[in-house]
């Protein structure tokens, strides 16, 4: 009997140890103490757009900014004075529509805050370490095709709330005495280590508007690949000018078809009672009017579908097709894929030429979409809301999603600079423990204003 007891006790101890390792994430390389190795975080600067800022659920707010991937990297590396443009809750979004909050999962319903937060450390007498600006573009489109970038543009950033409807350039850069551009403010910090993730919006704006439809006109195109390559090379050169020994980690551009904004609404008509596709006389699911095989229907279609668009009159609709602006057809998808392929080739080339480390966000996001990720028993997928990785706007990660991103950066940093920086314990980051749970009652119910503001953030 004692032998049986000892066997059971040993088995329980082993099981406890296994579960402990699973729940804590991979903290350090086995047998090797935590170390920054040759990575020099003396002055750590993060450059990029909303993904760097920690933007999520259509707003920038402090309780999420503390989980931006640069802030998490800084914490894991022992950086004690990593400053960000923190905004009190409920935060600030685009327009009067602010942070999204989900009020029901079955059916999925959400609302938005109209209250606004305020910057909490606007008087910091130096530039912020996190210079990620939501809406930033590598190339600012202009008729003369001049190589102007949001990273180097020294025009009056204080005018951006009026000129572009974007308050974040003013919020992040604040004071021209600290530098008139992201580049100048970054240089003022004399960086030793930089993360650079830029270029997503150079193609995402085109995709999110169904192929460039803005105010009824098809006017937007992805940044030309040659322009992207040239400007990215100039950004790399500028970083080298700041510090010849600078250490840089760059990330490439994910496939837009991997994010819920383009994958949540199916191409076929759903029966609102069963949440299953309506089958036509040919025995196949009936597509929304205006949608063909292979097309991606964006979240912007939700309010139109609710009003009867895309639905034949016999099924209770208004018999009008979904407009092109809410559908990314197969030809437009080819344009997007071509741009992303060219951008990622340029990023890889510039990284190789300059000795920068590279995070392959493209492959990581496609893996998440195809197979998901199992972390401490929690399944993360690319599903809208319930997948756990994305926030309520369908474009940006959640806090736990950003923790996963931080760990992907840390993997590359550890390998490149012989470091052993502990990974972030993803499950210790706030998040809704939903796992993979499908919506049970039809399509999500999201106010049109919220989705429109998410798209506006991506436009020049």
Task: Describe the predicted segments one by one.
Residues 19-23:
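C-terminal motif of bacterial Sec signal peptides marking the signal peptidase cleavage site
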Residues 1-11:
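Bacterial N-terminal signal peptides that target proteins for export
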Residues 25-460:
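Conserved active-site regions of diverse hydrolases
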């Amino acid at each position: 009997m004692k032998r049986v007891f000892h066997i059971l006790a040993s088995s329980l101890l082993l099981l406890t140890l296994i579960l402990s390792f699973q729940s804590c994430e991979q903290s350090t390389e086995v047998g090797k103490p935590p170390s920054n190795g040759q990575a020099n975080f003396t002055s750590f600067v993060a450059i990029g757009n909303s993904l760097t800022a920690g933007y999520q659920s259509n707003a920038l707010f402090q309780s999420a900014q503390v989980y931006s991937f640069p802030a998490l990297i800084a914490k894991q590396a022992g950086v004690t004075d990593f400053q960000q443009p923190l905004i009190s809750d409920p935060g600030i979004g685009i327009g009067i529509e602010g942070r999204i909050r989900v009020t029901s999962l079955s059916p999925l319903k959400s609302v938005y805050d109209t209250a606004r937060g305020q910057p909490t450390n606007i008087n910091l007498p130096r530039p912020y370490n996190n210079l990620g600006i939501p809406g930033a573009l590598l190339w600012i489109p202009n008729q003369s095709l001049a190589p102007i970038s949001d990273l180097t543009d020294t025009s009056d950033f204080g005018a951006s709330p009026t000129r572009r409807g974007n308050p974040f350039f003013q919020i992040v850069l604040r004071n021209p005495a600290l530098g008139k551009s992201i580049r100048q403010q970054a240089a003022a910090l004399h960086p030793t280590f930089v993360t650079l993730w830029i270029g997503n919006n150079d193609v995402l704006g085109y995709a999110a508007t169904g192929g460039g439809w803005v105010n009824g006109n098809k006017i937007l195109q992805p940044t030309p690949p040659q322009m992207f390559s040239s400007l990215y090379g100039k950004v790399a050169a500028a970083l080298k000018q700041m510090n010849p020994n600078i250490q840089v980690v760059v990330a490439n551009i994910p496939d837009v078809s991997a994010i819920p904004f383009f994958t949540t609404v199916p191409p076929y008509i759903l029966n609102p009672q069963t949440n299953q596709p309506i089958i036509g006389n040919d025995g196949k699911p009936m597509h929304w009017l205006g949608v063909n095989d292979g097309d991606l229907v964006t979240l912007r279609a939700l309010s139109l579908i609710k009003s009867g668009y895309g639905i034949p009159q016999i099924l209770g609709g208004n018999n009008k097709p979904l407009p092109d602006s809410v559908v990314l057809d197969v030809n437009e998808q080819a344009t997007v894929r071509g741009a992303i392929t060219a951008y990622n080739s340029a990023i890889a080339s510039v990284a190789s030429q300059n000795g920068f480390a590279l995070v392959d966000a493209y492959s990581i996001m496609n893996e998440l979409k195809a197979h998901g990720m199992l972390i401490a028993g929690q399944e993360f997928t690319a599903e809208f809301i319930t997948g756990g990785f994305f926030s309520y706007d369908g474009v940006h990660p959640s806090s736990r999603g950003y923790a996963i991103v931080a760990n992907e950066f840390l993997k590359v940093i550890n390998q490149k600079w012989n470091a052993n920086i502990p990974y972030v314990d993803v499950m210790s980051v706030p998040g809704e423990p939903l796992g993979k749970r499908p919506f049970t009652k039809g399509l999500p119910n999201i106010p049109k204003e919220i989705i429109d503001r998410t798209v506006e953030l991506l436009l020049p």
